């Protein structure tokens, strides 16, 4: 019996295009939800964006804590769903029929890249379920309790989940941007054009954030910790938007 060949007609192409659009929609919605910390500009949070962690907006003792924790959970689940859709559907970041798609399916880079995005989504969702009990950068009493180890275990767990989220985001950003640069035919998609700059900016913001955290832990001030971390999150969200837009652009070509 002859081996049946996979379908490649108009119906199959339409199905792939629809799947890619859904994936892009999940990523875009996740990026927007992930950026809702910016609403602190309009809300009387009482926390300074220059010196506080973004996670402290969602602390249990903060007036809008439940609101920000809920949005973090939604953001993480949306991005996780998009990444798992890419992995389980054996798709590529930008479709199946392009040079990028053909090259990406032959290697492990897209799998690791999308696994990084999935880790980012899962860890972000976990962050929302492991809230800080108070805002150490704005509350001297909270800081004293934290340094004395007199805070809930969720403080340590939150630090781990936050680190995993950023690590996953960096893995995905670097690898999927590399794939787009290496394999996308001209005219280049937005991810190939803009992705490298966002990756560099994210690395710089991450370095600044780590230095600021070290300074704060050593009692040497915040070094603009709030600004650094907000830039870090902003560049991740912007990259996700670019990825989603590039996926939609590819879907239109199918």
Locate the predicted segments by residue.
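Short, Lys/Arg-rich, polar N-terminal cytosolic tail immediately upstream
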Residues: 1-20
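Short, charged juxtamembrane terminal tails flanking transmembrane helices
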Residues: 2-3, 249-254
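Hydrophobic, aromatic-enriched alpha-helical segments typical of multi-pass transmembrane helices
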Residues: 14-250
């Amino acid at each position: 019996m002859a081996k049946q060949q996979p379908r490649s007609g108009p119906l199959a192409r339409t199905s792939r295009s629809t799947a890619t659009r859904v994936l892009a929609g999940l990523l875009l919605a996740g990026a927007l939800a992930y950026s809702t910390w910016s609403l602190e500009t309009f809300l009387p949070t009482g926390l300074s964006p220059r010196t506080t962690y973004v996670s402290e907006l969602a602390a249990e003792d903060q007036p809008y804590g439940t609101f920000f924790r809920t949005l973090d959970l939604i953001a993480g689940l949306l991005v996780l769903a998009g990444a798992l859709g890419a992995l389980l559907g054996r798709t590529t970041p930008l479709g199946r029929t392009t040079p990028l798609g053909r090259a990406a399916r032959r290697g492990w880079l897209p799998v690791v890249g999308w696994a990084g995005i999935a880790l980012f989504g899962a860890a972000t969702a976990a962050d929302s379920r492991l809230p800080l009990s108070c805002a150490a950068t704005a509350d001297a009493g909270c800081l004293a309790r934290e340094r004395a180890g007199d805070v809930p275990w969720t403080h340590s767990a939150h630090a781990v989940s936050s680190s995993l989220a950023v690590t996953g985001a960096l893995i995905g950003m670097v690898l999927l941007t590399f794939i787009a640069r290496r394999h996308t035919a001209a005219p280049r998609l937005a991810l190939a054009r803009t992705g490298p700059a966002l990756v560099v900016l994210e690395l710089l913001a991450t370095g600044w954030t780590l230095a600021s955290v070290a300074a704060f832990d050593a009692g040497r001030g915040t070094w603009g910790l709030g600004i650094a971390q907000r830039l870090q999150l902003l560049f991740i969200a912007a990259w996700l938007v670019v990825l989603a837009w590039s996926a939609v652009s590819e879907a239109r070509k199918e």
